[in-house]
Amino acid sequence: MQGPWVLLLLGLRLQLSLSVIPVEEENPAFWNKKAAEALDAAKKLQPIQTSAKNLIIFLGDGMGVPTVTATRILKGQLEGHLGPETPLAMDRFPYMALSKTYSVDRQVPDSASTATAYLCGVKTNYKTIGLSAAARFDQCNTTFGNEVFSVMYRAKKAGKSVGVVTTTRVQHASPSGTYVHTVNRNWYGDADMPASALREGCKDIATQLISNMDINVILGGGRKYMFPAGTPDPEYPNDANETGTRLDGRNLVQEWLSKHQGSQYVWNREQLIQKAQDPSVTYLMGLFEPVDTKFDIQRDPLMDPSLKDMTETAVKVLSRNPKGFYLFVEGGRIDRGHHLGTAYLALTEAVMFDLAIERASQLTSERDTLTIVTADHSHVFSFGGYTLRGTSIFGLAPLNALDGKPYTSILYGNGPGYVGTGERPNVTAAESSGSSYRRQAAVPVKSETHGGEDVAIFARGPQAHLVHGVQEQNYIAHVMASAGCLEPYTDCGLAPPADESQTTTTTRQTTITTTTTTTTTTTTPVHNSARSLGPATAPLALALLAGMLMLLLGAPAES
């Protein structure tokens, strides 16, 4: 388990539940000053009206607005703050909008149809990727003639380098939206396809990964779909469940290597770091697990690269092209954590996702790089219960429910955490802070479902001001194509970005910055605590604190 996550388990549970707030926050002048600073920055904000040399899209799979907020709290607390006041890297982007995520045939979408929207610019049907809505799920013969092409494909045609980074398998729905055309998102390898589809000429996703376009950087999981059936996995050579799956006998990794000069294949972090430093490498494939990568808290830091590591490597390799690059980066395990009902896994993945955004922002300039952060869909995830500011996002509500038992702030509308017809468990703070704890859910389903509400879009860089209002999800692809002067916007009329050497002093002037409150030594306890009240009300405050301590120690508090 990683060091910061150990800190989370051991440090947040007690200290933040009895946290103190800065005394200056009791003074209206504090809030007026913060608002005035934000207002002044907004007034000075000027759109960058040039074209974008580089295009980056960060996709937080399942990262709805409630997940963004909860991630902000968690990341802030990991950094030693109370939580909600501390901005995420994506929060610092100056432009934002809402995205309507429905697909052509579903009010609540999946990651395949949404990927087609934000990557290709066209909405489509559930479980299909890279095809128009004229195609039908699982019907191979509806593929041909209904293909739509991603902005990444158009960027490659324009001479840019392109890359895909994900914490899922690289053949999964979201990353494959950059290169695939398939009526079934689950056709990862040829062994996953029916014989009829193969006879009709449909290709599995792994085959299309290496044949549909020349992708310079491919980093994620998905080794088993690239090698002949029975091929031992290099990391798990004695595990028969992790061997290659291909029935056609093809070694797709070797085929990919033979196509490109300056190409390298790696399968662990050490190899990745080594090849990233080699200036002769212009094509890099790294597959770090047989299927999806491990959750970040379960990752071996010596063997398994983090999303931040992969993002940094991709930016460095792709930046070797003077014509620029297009990069897709997915925090794909956020979604899996939610499906399992394990909010701890989802939110710690989201923290790592934000760290990757932060690193990419450090490695690029907003003068020539349009960066967009968004989600494909939300989840039926929520948090509430009037928790005190500074308490762990994984903790309990301060008062019990009507059945006299405590409940967690985070809950799911449906999921595997449904408690059945019996009594609710008497959950403790220690249990609810565990990485494998499944949150209680209102409706029993094997896998918690997606949510249908709008998701956020954050943007910085050239043409980022086009991200505004409430938009259809496919609008995102059009913003990126237009900013990069790519098809169908090759006559965009935009000047190229200014030479970086002339703009280094103004690189970040257009970003609205949010001042992080620094807690001083002069502090006041949370409102209604004993030290913040006079003698007459002190007993009430002490009772509240005692109740919080009881919750932390696992005893039910009186409601």
UniProtKB/Swiss-Prot annotation:
Subunit structure: Homodimer.
Keywords for this protein: Calcium, Cell membrane, Disulfide bond, Glycoprotein, GPI-anchor, Hydrolase, Lipoprotein, Magnesium, Membrane, Metal-binding, Signal, Zinc
Name of this protein: Intestinal-type alkaline phosphatase
Tissue: Intestine and thymus.
Propeptide section residues: 529-559
One of the record's GO cellular component terms: side of membrane
InterPro entries (alphabetical): Alkaline_phosphatase, Alkaline_phosphatase_AS, Alkaline_phosphatase_core_sf
GO molecular function, a single term: alkaline phosphatase activity
Organism from which the protein derives: Mus musculus (Mouse)
EC number from the UniProt entry: 3.1.3.1
One of the protein's GO biological processes: multicellular organism growth
Gene: Iap
Record-listed Mg(2+) binding positions: D61, S174, E330
